Amino acid sequence: MQESQETHISNHLDEIVAAVSITPRKKLLNQLLQRALFQPPREKLRLSEEKAKSYASSHEYKKALHELVHCMALTRICYGDSHWKLAEAHVNLAKGYLQLKGMSLRAKQHAEKAKEILTSSVAPPYSDNTDVFKCSVELFHTLGQALLSLQKFKEASKNLTKAEILSKEMLQCGKIIKEEWMEIQARIKLSFAQVYQGQKKSKEALPHYQEALEYTEISRGEKSLECVPILRELAAAEQALGFHDASINNLIQAHLIVLRGSPSREEAATSAHSVACAAIASGRPEHHDVAEQYFQDSMANLKDAEGKETAKFLSIQDDYCHFLQVTGQDEKATSIFRESLEAKVAVFGDFSPEVAETYRLLGVADLAQGNQTGAHKKLKKCLQIQTLLYGPQDKRTLATQQTMDILSKAPEVPARPRPSPGAKAAFCAGGRPYSVPGRTRPSAAD
């Protein structure tokens, strides 16, 4: 009897404990649900704007775009169809579309809608509203960027000029402080530079890149990550103008900034690779050591991160081999090409442009050594893959076929210990197009 009472009391206590622990949880969930359902639209708008900024800062642009669409709908509910806040929401949405490839037209449409709203809504008291002026600057800048992406350079330049003039007027009237104006100027100057560079006018683009960098360094700091894309674009313009020392130095500066930001191995590799490529592009022997150093850094980072059997590693390794050929280190380049063949088959497929190109280069190397049998065998494999990929009338296929025709008519000559510069010049042109998977696995020993 006593045992039965104890059991009953124990069960009753369990029920009380469960009720105490579960009921508040249910109440909390209900409260959160009710709060979400009955949350004021302006509070929902604020939270959605914060989410959009968070997604954009972490480069999750599709999620950010979803929130920006939500923001525009909530802004219309909160402020109506004619308020400048709705124009601002359209501008922000246009910026979101610009982050996604192929969406420039949508960005332009939203920027134009914002312009339409501002044109019809700006009247007292809005005419004295600093926020409206800021929105107008962002509108003209964003519309300029959208037109730039659509390669409408003249219209883009007109809108960027409007943004520049308006921001200067705001500074003179005391509506913005100088630091804020410099941040705006940095973005506008960069867009102007891109307008000129898009038209291959590197000479006109150069001073705008330099001003954009100067304003960014002042407003954000010389070691800021915001300087990196500007330094890289500036380096490209300098390279196009033949200012190779300046180009290499700017890319090295960008690389050092990247390394300070604790990048991933792949990011560090990509940054080092850009320096190496700039050093090669100069065509000057004094830059060979720089190219060697940064190629090694790039490949070491990728090897540590993912191993040697990745598309990225093999692509950079091929660039390194071409550098070795340019500097007369043909035997080392050929050895690396030969060793990489099996990995390329595994990564790109048997019948891929990468495998075809490697067979072609190995065939050229054999030909330079006087090994006509080996050259014919490798070039034949290259021709088979090229015919499958590009067809028999493609210029790459025809070039390989022509080489084989000449080779088949030539008498066998003794193998030479060193490559012939003439042969290398005749047969060393080529690139690495996109990959196509295949089936049969060629032997790397061939």
UniProtKB/Swiss-Prot annotation:
Key word Repeat present: yes
Compartment annotation: Cell projection, Cilium
Lineage: superkingdom: Eukaryota
Transmembrane regions: none
Biological process terms in GO annotation: positive regulation of smoothened signaling pathway
Primary localisation category: other
Sequence segments annotated as region (Disordered): 410-446
InterPro entries xref list: TPR-like_helical_dom_sf, TPR_rpt, TTC23/TTC23L
One cellular-component annotation, GO: cilium
Signal peptide: none
Disulfide bonds: none
TPR repeat positions: 45-78, 137-170, 186-219, 310-347, 356-389
Keyword terms, alphabetized: Cell projection, Repeat, TPR repeat
Protein task: Participates positively in the ciliary Hedgehog (Hh) signaling.
Quaternary assembly: Associated with the EvC complex composed of EFCAB7, IQCE, EVC2 and EVC.
Full protein name: Tetratricopeptide repeat protein 23
